[in-house]
């Protein structure tokens, strides 16, 4: 049978301005309305608001719209305190007051746990911090604009690869913020600006760290300018050249003091961005676990020992397990640095069966997990076999927490406590802590 060419149907987007009423926020912080019974997502809109929107995307099951005007504002709406907020992709909830942000995140956490884990529970008090000056590390993008012959230093625009030039970031730790104007001036005079990659700034307790990603070796003139800048500002300087190799140039090795333990780290290592929330989080985790001096504790996804070392001060022995070998070595160094002798660290792929591993032969009544966004799939199924009676799960992704909760519930655990950790104020990013206790 002959086939005749049929042109694809092109649906035209109705771009006229349309009024809608926002019903609630979705889990990413966008306003949710309904247009012709179809879900419509509007960034920057708040529940209860009547707004004017223009469609930007219209799919079969949902649509997206640009906020044109707020016709009837919410009582929770506030003026953003950052001059870059309208363009920058870093924060997405500065238009919502602080109490509203916390309420939204708690509600989102509760809804996800009910939907995917079937668990409804009154939340513990949220763990919060100051909402400005809290970020002790940040990565800033660099791009040389050939047309304007100017360097762009800042953060990515919302839903774009373009860069918003930033000379002041209110959520950045003040001593890091102070570096931005002079750092921009320094790099704007770079001999080969097209080779600039990105900049990382980290605030340790003993030093500020500057990491420059550069494509290829630096010419002598640029190297001298950079080291002079680091010396004048008393910075620890690292270069990241080909293949992600980290090269220490000058300055003392950084460390941070966390709940009575000193954690040495490299800029390539993970440390929590919000120091205040991290410290409260560690204290809460230890309180929820209720560790006694006769118990062995297992810390999974242990990193540099953020939880492991404080746990070791309460337990008979602690085992920390981490997937990255370099982190294991550094965690071992941190234990020695703090003169803690009842802890051992191991490298392992925690997606695999660990029940036959040497460290798993002696059981653990108390277990703490702090996985990455992918969650603890694999090891979470083995917690009963490892002897766990009480489990604290620290999560940076409520969706994978809800998924992994199903495994724990099927093993005979019950959800005892649940709380929100506001690690990133003014963003929709949600972290949480859950306590599971074995029935009987």
Swiss-Prot record:
Protein name: 23S rRNA (uracil(1939)-C(5))-methyltransferase RlmD
EC number: 2.1.1.190
Domain TRAM: 11-69
Keyword rRNA-binding (UniProt): no
Function statement: Catalyzes the formation of 5-methyl-uridine at position 1939 (m5U1939) in 23S rRNA.
SUPFAM superfamilies in the record: Nucleic acid-binding proteins (SSF50249), S-adenosyl-L-methionine-dependent methyltransferases (SSF53335)
Domain of life: Bacteria
Keyword hit for 4Fe-4S: yes
Gene Ontology biological process: rRNA base methylation
Coiled coil segments of this chain: none
Positions that bind [4Fe-4S] cluster: 82, 88, 91, 169
Binding site for S-adenosyl-L-methionine: 272, 301, 306, 322, 349, 370
Family recorded in the similarity comment: Belongs to the class I-like SAM-binding methyltransferase superfamily. RNA M5U methyltransferase family. RlmD subfamily.
Active site: 396 (nucleophile)
Catalytic activity: uridine(1939) in 23S rRNA + S-adenosyl-L-methionine = 5-methyluridine(1939) in 23S rRNA + S-adenosyl-L-homocysteine + H(+)
Keyword annotations of the record: 4Fe-4S, Iron, Iron-sulfur, Metal-binding, Methyltransferase, rRNA processing, S-adenosyl-L-methionine, Transferase
A GO molecular-function descriptor: 4 iron, 4 sulfur cluster binding
Top EC class of this enzyme: transferase
């Amino acid at each position: 049978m002959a086939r005749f060419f049929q042109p694809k149907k092109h649906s035209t987007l109705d771009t006229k301005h349309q009024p809608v009423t926002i019903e609630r926020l979705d889990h990413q912080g966008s306003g949710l309305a309904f247009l012709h019974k179809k879900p419509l997502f509007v960034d920057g809109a708040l529940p209860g608001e009547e707004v004017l929107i223009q469609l930007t995307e219209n799919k079969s099951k949902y649509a997206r719209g640009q906020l044109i005007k707020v016709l009837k504002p919410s009582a929770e709406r506030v003026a953003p305190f950052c001059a870059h907020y309208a363009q920058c992709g870093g924060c997405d909830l500065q238009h919502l007051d602080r109490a509203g942000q916390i309420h939204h995140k708690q509600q989102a956490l509760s809804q996800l746990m009910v939907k995917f884990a079937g668990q409804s529970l009154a939340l513990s008090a949220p763990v919060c911090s100051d909402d400005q000056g809290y970020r002790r590390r940040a990565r800033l993008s660099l791009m040389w604009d050939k047309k304007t012959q100017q360097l762009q230093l800042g953060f990515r625009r919302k839903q774009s690869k373009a860069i918003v030039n930033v000379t002041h970031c209110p959520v950045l730790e003040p001593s890091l913020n102070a570096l931005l104007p002079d750092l921009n001036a320094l790099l704007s005079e770079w001999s080969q600006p097209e080779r600039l990659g990105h900049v990382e700034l980290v605030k340790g307790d003993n030093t500020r760290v500057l990491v420059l990603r550069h494509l290829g070796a630096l010419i002598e003139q640029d190297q001298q300018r950079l080291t002079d800048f680091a010396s004048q500002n008393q910075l620890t300087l690292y270069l990241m050249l080909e293949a992600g190799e980290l090269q220490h140039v000058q300055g003392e090795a950084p460390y941070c003091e966390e709940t009575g333990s000193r954690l040495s780290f490299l800029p390539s290592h993970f440390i929590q961005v919000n120091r205040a929330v991290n410290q409260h989080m560690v204290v809460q985790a230890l309180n929820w676990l209720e560790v006694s001096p006769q118990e062995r504790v297992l810390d999974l996804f242990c990193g540099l020992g953020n939880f492991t070392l404080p746990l070791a001060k309460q337990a008979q022995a602690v085992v920390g397990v981490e997937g990255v070998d370099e982190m294991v070595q550094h965690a071992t160094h941190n234990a020695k640095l703090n003169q803690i002798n009842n802890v051992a660290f191991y490298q392992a792929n925690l997606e695999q069966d660990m029940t036959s591993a040497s460290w798993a032969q002696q059981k653990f009544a108390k277990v703490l997990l702090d996985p990455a966004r992918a969650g603890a799939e694999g090891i979470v199924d083995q917690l009963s076999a490892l002897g766990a009676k009480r489990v604290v799960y620290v999560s940076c992704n409520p969706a994978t927490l809800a998924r992994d909760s199903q495994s724990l519930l099927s093993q005979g655990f019950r959800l005892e406590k649940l709380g929100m950790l506001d690690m990133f104020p003014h963003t929709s990013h949600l972290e949480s802590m859950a306590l599971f206790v074995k029935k009987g």
